[in-house]
Amino acid sequence: MQRIGVTDYTILGTVKGAELELVRFTHPFMGFDVPAILGDHVTRMPVPVPFTPRLPRPGRLCDRSEIRPGKPLTRLARTALICRALIRRWMARTSYSDSVNCHTQPISAIFDYKDLRFEPPSNRISPAGQTSVDRLLQLSQGQAVEGQSAVARLTGEKKNHPGAQYANRLSPRIANNHPATQQTLFELGSGAKERNAINVSYLTALGTPGFTLMLPARMLCGIVSDNNFTQKQLCPSPARCTRGPAEPAKRGPWLEPGLVIRKDGLRTGKLLSSLRGLCLTVLRFQPTVPCFCRLALSSSVAISSTGLVNFSR
């Protein structure tokens, strides 16, 4: 928060026994509210001896509870198990000095300001190794509408993404909302089935001009934007997407007319710009027409009604 000059914030609640505070503040550059978790809880959270450092199944991170100002958040003892595993996972990736950046996100969940609910993200893995898209969030003026969709295969193959049939994959209630209505559609999928693919998650957005998306900077592997959403191949190794500019022939044909946002927040391309602040990369869509956008993420994601992407794995 000091990095972007935030001095005033509102405390929404505290996490029992973890020295954490859930706060909300107004971003000084973009003007929207940002939820954040403050505290060095990873190295200080007590870990019961019987617990082993292994992660639970997706959707089992924490219990469903209410967030109210001045009252602690109830949580399962399994949260300590998650934190112990995260310590080993992140030691090789980053330092503990920026704990809010990488260590709070894996135990975060969806924050819905409409009724201040606190719920864990959920997803289902089909036997074929694909992610069954069971949650679609539609954002319009900060309000989220949940819907169900059919199984979507986000492997980057052309036959799986015909532009004319994409809307037919969604539920009727969601498919009727065309991008011309100035609404934004998100979809979560996995690309681990490909032979040379790394086990990452892909976030597909149907973005409209001026839409803003926030996500933790260190979790973004790459982003590809395409007006047609066809004939594009995902990078087989997301790590290659973060090494800076390179020849399109070495990176794949999907770079044209797409673009890639690197981990350091620098941008290449002309459709999208990024802003670094409070450990978040703020992506603002600036196309002239609604376009599809796919993000390669290094963890599973859950999207809130404010556009903040929390990671859980």
Curated annotation (Swiss-Prot):
Molecular-function GO term, any one: beta-lactamase activity
Residues annotated as catalytic: 190 (acyl-ester intermediate)
Superkingdom in the source lineage: Bacteria
GO biological process: antibiotic catabolic process; response to antibiotic
Annotated InterPro entries: Beta-lactam_class-C_AS
GO CC annotations on file: outer membrane-bounded periplasmic space
Signal sequence segment: 1-15
Keywords in alphabetical order: Antibiotic resistance, Hydrolase, Signal
Expression induction: By penicillin G, impenem and AmpR.
The EC number(s) this enzyme carries: 3.5.2.6
Family per record: Belongs to the class-C beta-lactamase family.
Protein known as: Beta-lactamase
Organism: Burkholderia multivorans (strain ATCC 17616 / 249)
